[in-house]
From Swiss-Prot:
Residues 24-458 are annotated as: Catalytic. Residues 1-23 form the signal peptide. One of its GO terms (biological process) is cellulose catabolic process. GO terms for molecular function: cellulose 1,4-beta-cellobiosidase activity; cellulose binding. It is found in: Secreted. It comes from Aspergillus terreus (strain NIH 2624 / FGSC A1156). This is Probable 1,4-beta-D-glucan cellobiohydrolase B. InterPro entries: CBD_sf, Cellulose-bd_dom_fun, ConA-like_dom_sf, Glyco_hydro_7, Glyco_hydro_7_sf. Residues 459-505 are annotated as: Ser/Thr-rich linker. Disulfide bonds join C513-C530, C524-C540. It holds the Pfam family Glyco_hydro_7.
Amino acid sequence: MPSTYDIYKKLLLLASFLSASQAQQVGTSKAEVHPSLTWQTCTSGGSCTTVNGKVVVDANWRWVHNVDGYNNCYTGNTWDTTLCPDDETCASNCALEGADYSGTYGVTTSGNSLRLNFVTQASQKNIGSRLYLMEDDSTYKMFKLLNQEFTFDVDVSNLPCGLNGAVYFVSMDADGGMAKYPANKAGAKYGTGYCDSQCPRDLKFINGMANVEGWEPSANDANAGTGNHGSCCAEMDIWEANSISTAYTPHPCDTPGQVMCTGDSCGGTYSSDRYGGTCDPDGCDFNSYRQGNKTFYGPGMTVDTKSKITVVTQFLTNDGTASGTLSEIKRFYVQNGKVIPNSESTWSGVSGNSITTAYCNAQKTLFGDTDVFTKHGGMEGMGAALAEGMVLVLSLWDDHNSNMLWLDSNYPTDKPSTTPGVARGSCDISSGDPKDVEANDANAYVVYSNIKVGPIGSTFSGSTGGGSSSSTTATSKTTTTSATKTTTTTTKTTTTTSASSTSTGGAQHWAQCGGIGWTGPTTCVAPYTCQKQNDYYSQCL
């Protein structure tokens, strides 16, 4: 008789065969070659080092065909019922193919610049794209942003109403889910593992299995549909924008990392109960137009969308360390060498120019929005995701659900534009229909470039145009080392700051106590003093 150990070994072997037969497969027709994209990490001294990164297109955009041939598993917005009668069989029968980035998806890179075209006509018409920054060819780059700032340049001059060039972070797995879900044989190399705070149900594959069961083709999107399952995780929207409007928005979840949901319990855009899931689909947004300043962002405005914009986002903590609790998300812009603080909210009762718990509570109350932000953890919940590490997403898309009116027009459309929170941009409420923008704005595109990450105040420089009690001079020097082909940019900042008095009613140790746009306390509790780090951030030390 065979021993118990022999039976155990045979069972393990059988399990491995079953796992392979039911796995999400990889195609062999076209090699996957990731476009190169450089970016920089900076230090508190202002020295930035170039990193040779790459980008990968999301699995949802890829050709899915049978493993042994060239028959489509998915055509238009429907699955082949023979190849894909259920989730497991479909994953076994179908493979994700390598990508032709420029020819099929309209994605091109040059140095530190990434251009995404809106419509690309190849053998089929491609609409938009979603890409992820990679650590290497099989791993996404994970960013931990507490007590850090994230900076990039963007050109939105060719993004009209109805389009969204989005830069954001999501709590995907670094390997695309391969370790957690052995059925996933494609992994980050092929752009798998996507999730966000909408718990999207339009994904063709989740956790290594197809999402064919319960699939319903979209009524107004020839390329999409929804299945029984969704993929949830925390989301930090750094930049959702076109040439008319922009917003930045944290979206916490009960669990920061990726989890699969089922049916309407997913919540979000794809479910009948928007707030029925474990994530915050609305978030707490800062849109300058929605907050009352209608001349701050747009063509020819303070932040002029006819020209390239440098966007700076800072993630401040309560104690000024990476182990602290997220307390504030600040925004600056730089154009033509001038630093522009984010606009102030002009609504009575909703003050400030950054995202804080107080701002979010006041905004939700005034606008009458359902406060699921607090329900799912608020700033602390968002901070938990930032601490664990998140993947950078760079995308361009149109909106088959609400025509992007939530970003750039009046929304909801059945309320007067004078109602607080309804007016979000100057686009007409008839704008943004995907069939119109895809036909009339097919040549639209967005360019992202010059991505930098580092400690607060390390990734940008520029003049303030006056209004500061301190003088700041910034110079940059770029050198190239031939042996390593690494470019280093060094920024030296000289500041003169008057001492701040202490007070028992001042800011606590490590807290912010000054900077352009700061409206909080400017003194510190004894024995600490307010020490200037740069024109935009002073800290009690």
